[in-house]
Design a protein with these regions (language model features):
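Bacterial N-terminal signal peptides
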Residues: 8-17
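Extracellular or exported targeting regions of proteins
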Residues: 24-205
Length: 205
């Protein structure tokens, strides 16, 4: 499939050193909200900071209606994530209309990530909020190539008619030791161009 070739190419382009980086599969667990918040706060509530980076899809009816949402928050004392930082992401076409190629996932220079008990008796690298929040599409996989992580969607995110609240991924997230910085991430698609640059927030590294 073209989208899989794009994934491999994107990861290789971003993660190459002297030799091609080897893929390291990450553990992904499905969770619900607000239960997953308990990893970061004793009362299972978190105060978040949101930002968006617009995906420059060329044939939308209105600009700035396709975006990557970055969400950051801090781990409180007395929790598994105490002193750490949480990061969540969501790819959204909910406000978009017109036509666009289907989107396959996210390439993110995230740096080191932490394993935490996001679900009962399950320590994982990545969590996906499949209930209790926005979204209709989860993750098929998450793979690390050096400092870069490639998140492949469980199915392509496609623009179907006008604005639709179903046209978004679930929030998926990770944790790290450091506060955020802004970087350029890549959204990969089934069309041409195969990659769209988009602003995102990641741990400082």
């Amino acid at each position: 499939m073209r989208i899989l070739k794009v994934v491999a190419g994107a990861a290789a382009a971003l993660a190459l050193g002297a030799l091609a980086a080897r893929a390291q599969p990450l553990t992904v667990v499905e969770v619900n909200a607000p239960a997953v918040n308990c990893v970061f706060h004793p009362a299972c509530t978190i105060t978040v900071s949101d930002s968006v980076g617009f995906i420059p899809l060329p044939y939308l009816a209105a600009p700035n209606t396709a975006f990557l949402q970055s969400r950051t928050f801090s781990g409180a004392a007395g929790t598994p994530a105490a002193g750490k930082a949480g990061y969540m992401y969501r790819i959204s076409l909910t406000q978009a209309a017109g036509s666009a190629d289907c989107l396959g996932g996210l390439v993110l220079n995230f740096g080191p990530a932490l394993k935490l008990p996001y679900a009962p008796n399950k320590v994982a690298d990545v969590f996906v909020i499949t209930s209790g929040g926005l979204g209709s599409i989860g993750l098929k996989s998450a793979e690390r190539f050096g400092e870069v992580i490639v998140f492949e969607l469980a199915r392509p995110l496609c623009l179907d008619g006008g604005p639709n609240l179903a046209n978004t991924t679930f929030f998926f997230g990770l944790a790290a030791d450091t506060p955020s910085m802004t970087t350029a991430a890549q959204i990969f698609s089934s069309g041409n161009p195969p990659l769209y640059s988009v602003d995102a927030r990641v741990p400082s590294h």
